[in-house]
């Protein structure tokens, strides 16, 4: 079973009313995680976290079920998109009428890079490191890119770890 959690990006909501919902969204994620795990039908769980709301929310929700083996898997860092200077140059050129709206939209679309944590070392990345330090991530997984062979290997390792922990918990019952 895969469960989804609502998420907001406070990087996008900066300076808007939605920014005030940042911590509330973390609590909603925690409750959603607890609800998903509350059915008592799981032998273990793997939580896939990415940002500074989702990771703590998943962790808080999982702590409600301390008897359930849970392994956290980080998303890893986003690949770099269009450099800021290039984006700024396209915006300036558009403002001067030197490039078309289509070229502006193309540059803006390249600004958002893809899956993974934000490309700056903010709280999303530090949350992944903290989870690794606490031992709930597979060691070394925090900064492996999402679409790499190594990421796939870490994902397989996370599943194997969840199964091993579950087997150990059954032995001690």
State the predicted function of each range.
Residues 1-70:
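Long, structured ligand/cofactor-binding scaffold of large enzymes
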Residues 76, 135-158:
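Terminal amphipathic helices with adjacent charged low-complexity linkers/tails
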């Amino acid at each position: 079973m895969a469960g989804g959690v609502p998420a907001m990006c406070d990087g996008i909501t900066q300076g808007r009313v939605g920014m005030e919902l940042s911590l509330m969204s973390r609590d909603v994620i925690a409750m959603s995680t607890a609800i998903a795990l509350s059915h008592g039908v799981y032998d273990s769980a793997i939580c896939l976290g990415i940002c500074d709301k989702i990771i703590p929310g998943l962790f808080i929700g999982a702590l409600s079920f301390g008897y359930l083996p849970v392994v956290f898997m980080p998303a890893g860092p986003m690949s770099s998109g269009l450099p800021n200077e290039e984006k700024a140059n396209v915006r300036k050129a558009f403002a001067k009428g030197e490039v078309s709206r289509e070229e502006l939209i193309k540059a803006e679309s390249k600004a958002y890079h893809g899956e993974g944590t934000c490309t700056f070392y903010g709280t999303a990345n530090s949350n992944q490191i903290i989870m690794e330090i606490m031992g709930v991530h597979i060691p070394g997984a925090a900064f492996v890119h999402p679409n790499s062979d190594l990421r796939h290997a870490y994902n397989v390792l996370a599943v194997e770890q969840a199964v091993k922990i579950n087997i150990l918990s059954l032995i001690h019952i």
